[in-house]
């Protein structure tokens, strides 16, 4: 017995109630079960800085597809959700919120600010959770984590102290990204690079003791105050005689050396560059190689400091104008050339970032990177698709020490304590009782917090209880797959891998599935500035979560960007309606019937064909899923349901359903096949469209608990019917051929015809003959005659050639001869006029020589087309006699 479905599919009536039921029944929850193989993944934790965007929707849809698939395959599937504290991003948001209330962050103080930020976290983490639930994701909400919860904080502290004690963490001076507005260091991920209109200022640097000078081009003339050398390429013949000599720094009149370094591109500009080690990362490295002094000429707010002489106190851009004016006045400015160049800005406040030399906490990366490199080379870790191997290796093989300290309040505070007496620091889990250097008992904790990526790098194992040796960690770790975007391979993926090896001795996952960005219909990245962002919740509200999910996965290929627009969502909704309507038809005809498995002998070729087709589909989709070809997998399911099942088998089934009173056994047989195949198709579709499939499945098989807890379809040898697949492929070809002929001849649907099928293959003939009653409606036939020869077929019958057979349609069944001859005569007259006109145009020498070539060619093409059409019309007229 089955239940009926509502007349139309309304996601709003289903999705929320369905999700509540799943949660109440703990279907998403996983506990250690040694009798099952685990499958684990961790959610890339979204930032608590606002609403989710379409990229989050894609990322979590992909993960949910995998976790639902593995759960149905029988794995003990665990998906750990959570959110990221997002350090500076959140701090900026809360600071702005306070500003709107007229509250100054500094006046509020650290503790007061943190209290407000925790309030923000509670509000937005809950919002994000609700948004994810609307998408239908099946993560274990009982295990939801936060990168600053007690367990994660314990892991962060343990890692910092462990790395410090092993000599990997140190405090030192290096070039970092500095935001003058937020007054903190930034990670590369927090710096957006955008092309801006700027200039190259060409400046003369006199060579000491000569009347020569070097011409240097710079986009930041204000940093001239901190220059400590000029560099040229060692192989540049133009400058070999002056390497080792001194140049005079304009305006400052300080002597600086001319050094040779392979960093210089001798083909770019003049082949000579100014070196400012305290204000450029590349110059910093050159400075280290040549033992150059580092002169920082900027304050934290990007004003010039006391080392800037008369420019001290000026804003960097004010100083730039003043310095350029002075260079021009004193004859050092050669020229100013407009130049478009990339400028780094803080992604949260939009301020132009300054590369500054600062004392910060760093992680030494050379040794930590080695196991992460080896993991890829030995196959312990793989990327899907493989092309991202190169990006991963490039970053690791060129890795620099990681700046982990931030001058903000929101985040994990660095566990370093400074002696109030001697200033030395101690790294410890708790504030020390006594200074090991001077014996003082008073300490102050480091004000800085850790880079947000420091805690998220531990996510795969901190969420399972590390550093404690928990049963969860032993059973569920390492995780199986990480799903993430290609834009954070360096910032997050690499750091998780080396952290996994450093602290657990294992890779945190064995596969990284990379997806691309979601772009708009024009291929542009979605952004606030373009105003082209699409809110996934609005799409869900209008079309339902399943339609959004199907849109995001259809055509999706690992690593590739995708375009998103409403027409695609409408197509997905139409598919949902197609599935619903076909299912409703089946359920209505099952009614109160107990559909039993029929004897094999009762199965028609069409029954065996559709069973064989869904069987092959299960095998193919499983292979695609295991290769992470989720877009290909869902396309196969889509095509099967829409084409083979709905458009062919359901239509073929109608004859036996509607003649149930005449043959109850045949009706039971076809209903069993419909129920069985629909059930299999719903299972294969479920990971992609969980709500609609669950609703239909529970109506189809009400005795079962849940579709998501049912078994994934597996290939059955007893459902392999190649001969019947062959028969159905021929029937489909015959039907399509007949439909094409009828369309070409404008035969109305109400007009039925005889159909002669001539074939020599006895098995094929028998197969088709056994289905003639079912296929008559599809072919608009009133009679189907199977013959091995053409005898009895009228000479003027229209023929359709298909593999292994020829189909004939008596012409008198298709058209009224007199009406058709009259129509063809009119068409002949029209075509003759068009041919005459085109020939006249092409015979006109003036037209041929003066008109644009494309217009002349267009007339030639028309003449050729009309001539072909006229020949076809005449042939049809001759056929009609």
Model-derived segments and their meaning:
Residues 1-54, 77, 334, 347, ...:
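Non-catalytic terminal extensions that flank enzyme cores
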Residues 3, 8, 17, 21-25, ...:
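Residue patterns forming the tRNA-binding/recognition surfaces of aminoacyl-tRNA synthetases
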Residues 56-58, 281-286, 495-503, 637:
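Alpha-helical support elements that line or immediately flank enzyme active sites
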Residues 57-65, 215-250, 273-280, 290-297, ...:
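Extended active-site and interfacial segments that coordinate phosphate-rich ligands
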Residues 68-76, 97-110, 130, 134-139, ...:
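Secondary-structure transition/capping motifs at alpha-helix termini
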């Amino acid at each position: 017995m089955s239940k009926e479905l509502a007349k139309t599919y309304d996601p709003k009536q289903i999705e929320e109630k369905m999700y509540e039921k799943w949660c109440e029944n703990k279907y998403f929850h996983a506990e250690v079960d040694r009798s099952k193989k685990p499958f684990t993944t961790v959610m890339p934790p979204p930032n608590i800085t606002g609403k989710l965007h379409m990229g989050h929707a894609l990322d979590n849809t992909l993960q949910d597809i995998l976790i639902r698939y593995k759960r149905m395959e029988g794995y003990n599937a665990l998906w750990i959700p959570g959110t990221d504290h997002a350090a500076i991003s959140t701090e900026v948001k809360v600071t702005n919120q306070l500003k709107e209330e007229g509250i100054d962050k500094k006046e509020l103080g650290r503790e007061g600010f943190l209290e407000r930020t925790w309030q923000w976290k509670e509000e937005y983490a809950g919002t994000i959770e609700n948004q994810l639930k609307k998408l239908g994701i099946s993560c274990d909400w009982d295990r939801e984590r936060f990168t600053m919860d007690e367990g994660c904080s314990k892991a962060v502290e343990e890692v910092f102290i462990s790395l410090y004690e092993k000599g990997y963490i140190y405090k030192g001076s290096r070039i970092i990204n500095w935001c003058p507005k937020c007054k903190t260091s930034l990670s590369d991920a927090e710096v957006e690079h955008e092309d801006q209109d700027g200039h190259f200022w060409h400046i003369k640097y006199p060579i000491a003791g000569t009347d020569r000078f070097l011409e240097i081009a710079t986009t930041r003339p204000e940093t001239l105050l901190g220059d400590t050398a000029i560099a040229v390429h060692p192989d540049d013949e133009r400058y070999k005689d002056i390497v080792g000599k001194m140049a005079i720094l304009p305006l400052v009149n300080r002597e600086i050396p001319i050094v040779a370094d392979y960093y210089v591109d001798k083909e770019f500009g003049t082949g000579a560059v100014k070196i400012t080690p305290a204000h450029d990362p590349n110059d910093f490295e050159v400075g280290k190689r040549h033992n150059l002094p580092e002169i920082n000429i900027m304050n934290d707010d990007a004003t010039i400091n006391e080392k800037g002489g008369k420019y001290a106190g000026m804003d960097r851009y004010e100083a730039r104008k003043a310095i350029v004016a002075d260079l021009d006045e004193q004859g050092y400015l050669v020229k100013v050339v407009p130049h478009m160049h990339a400028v780094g800005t803080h992604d949260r406040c939009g301020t132009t970032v300054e590369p500054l030399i600062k004392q910060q906490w760093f992680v030494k990366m050379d040794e930590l990177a080695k196991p992460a490199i080896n993991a890829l080379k030995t196959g312990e870790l793989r990327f899907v698709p493989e092309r991202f191997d190169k990006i991963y290796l490039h970053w690791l093989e060129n890795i620099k020490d990681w700046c982990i300290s931030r001058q903000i309040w929101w985040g994990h505070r660095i566990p370093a304590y400074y002696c109030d007496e001697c200033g030395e620091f101690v790294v410890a889990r708790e504030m020390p009782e006594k200074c090991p250097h001077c014996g003082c008992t008073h300490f102050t904790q480091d004000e800085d917090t850790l880079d947000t990526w420091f805690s998220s790098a531990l996510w795969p194992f901190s969420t399972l209880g590390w550093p404690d040796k928990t049963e969860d960690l032993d059973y569920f770790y390492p995780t199986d797959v990480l799903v993430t975007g290609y834009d954070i391979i360096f910032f997050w993926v690499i750091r998780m891998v080396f952290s996994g090896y450093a602290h657990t001795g294992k890779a945190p996952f064995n596969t990284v599935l990379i997806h691309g960005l979601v772009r708009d219909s024009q291929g542009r990245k979605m952004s606030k500035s373009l105003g082209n962002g699409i809110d996934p919740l609005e799409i869900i509200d209008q079309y339902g979560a399943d339609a959004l999910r199907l849109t995001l996965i259809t055509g999706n290929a690992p690593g590739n960007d995708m375009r998103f627009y409403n027409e695609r969502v409408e197509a997905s909704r139409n598919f949902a309606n197609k599935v619903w309507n076909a299912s409703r038809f089946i359920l209505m005809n099952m009614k109160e019937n107990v559909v039993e498995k029929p004897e094999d002998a009762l199965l028609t070729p069409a029954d065996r064909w559709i069973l064989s087709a869904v069987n092959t589909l299960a095998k193919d989709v499983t292979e695609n899923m295991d290769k992470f070809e989720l877009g290909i997998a869902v396309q196969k399911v889509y095509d099967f349901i829409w084409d083979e099942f709905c458009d062919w088998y359901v239509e073929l089934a109608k004859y036996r359903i509607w003649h149930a009173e005449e043959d109850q056994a045949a009706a039971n047989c076809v209903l069993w096949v419909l129920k069985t195949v629909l059930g299999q198709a719903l299972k294969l579709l479920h990971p992609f469209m969980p709500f609609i499939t669950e609703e239909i499945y529970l109506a189809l098989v009400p005795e079962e608990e849940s579709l998501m807890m049912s078994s994934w379809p597996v290939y059955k040898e007893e459902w392999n019917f190649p001969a019947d697949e062959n028969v159905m492929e021929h029937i489909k070809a015959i039907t399509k051929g007949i439909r094409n002929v009828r369309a070409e001849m404008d035969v109305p649907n109400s007009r039925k015809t005889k159909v002669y099928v001539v074939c020599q293959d006895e098995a094929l003939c028998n197969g088709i003959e056994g289905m003639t009653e079912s296929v008559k409606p599809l072919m608009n036939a009133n009679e189907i005659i199977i013959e091995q020869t053409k005898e009895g077929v009228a000479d003027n019958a229209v023929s359709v050639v298909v593999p292994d057979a020829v189909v004939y349609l008596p012409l008198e069944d298709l058209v009224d001869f007199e009406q058709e001859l009259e129509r063809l005569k009119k068409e002949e007259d029209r075509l003759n006029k068009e041919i005459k006109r085109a020939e006249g145009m092409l015979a006109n020498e003036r037209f041929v020589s003066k008109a644009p070539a494309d217009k002349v060619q267009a007339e030639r093409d028309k003449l050729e087309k009309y001539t072909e059409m006229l020949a076809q019309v005449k042939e049809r007229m001759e056929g009609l006699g």
